[in-house]
């Protein structure tokens, strides 16, 4: 378990964040644990929210947690598809991803992921890209909707 002194905690924690005592409780219970954080793509296209998100992930990392970020990219994907003249089809709120669409989705998500990783590295937060195209970690079955 990572030992962090109170003086160090006060330097790491944002001034508007939780109290040191509250953080210490979580550190004792969850230090060196993986934390999976899902962040929607619409949050990350706002530069101010993106910067706050990066700062929060960096803070978690400095506290000894191991954050894993799972991100979306809906707005960027829609914008890129529109730019390329590819019409999006949705069924019950889910995007139908044909071959042409999935290639754009993969490209946009990989670029977005690289931006997140680069921003984290600039904050001295150890991070790396993991995605299905490069790391071959996801297999998919076609779902037929009624």
Question: PLM ranges: what are they?
Answer:
Residues 1-146:
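Nucleotide/pyrophosphate-binding catalytic subdomain
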